[in-house]
C-alpha cells in the first residue's frame, strides 16, 4: 500500500465510526418482540450488522409475503431513541481533525439509509465529513462497489487515492471490487491491505503526526 497516494479516507459507520452493537440489537429485538419472535442470535446479529434494512427484514421475516406491517411498525418505532446507545469510537474526533489538517477528504460509505443523518446530527459530526453515501444513494449497496465509486466520481479520486476502513466481509468485497485500499478494522479475519485496531492506528498508518 502506497500511503503517499492516499487523498481520502472513507469509513464504514457501524462497527467503525461507532460501536452500534447495543443500539442495533435493541432496535431489532424490539422489532422481533413485537411480532412474537425471539431475540437475535449471535449469528443473526453478525449478518444483520452487514445487511441493508431490506436485506435484514427479508432475512428475519422470510415467512412474510408482504413487509407492509413490519415497515409500518418500524416507522412508528423510529430509530431516534436508539441512537443514544451508539458510542463513537475512541479517538475518532482527533483522527478526523488530523485528517482535515493534513488535507485528506473524510467520507462515509454505509449501508444505513435514512438514519445516517440523525446519527451524525445527534453526535454533532455533521460538518466533519466531506461526503456521506448511504445505501439509499446508490443502486447497489455494499458488497457492491457503488458507494465507493460514487465518492470517487464526485470528488474526482482514483481508486489508489482511497483508503476504505471497514469491519465486515461486505466492506472487504466492496473495496476489492472498487479497487481501493482496504484497512480492516478490529477484524483480523478479513483480507486487507492492512489491519488496524484503533483510530490511532489509522493516524499512525498515514503518518499524520509527522505532518504537524
PLM ranges: what are they?
Residues 16, 20, 110, 180:
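Ser/Thr-centric signal marking residues that sit
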Residues 88, 109, 140:
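Residue-level marker of regulatory loop/turn positions in helix-turn-helix DNA-binding domains and
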Residues 23, 69, 110-111, 142, ...:
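A generic alpha-helix signature
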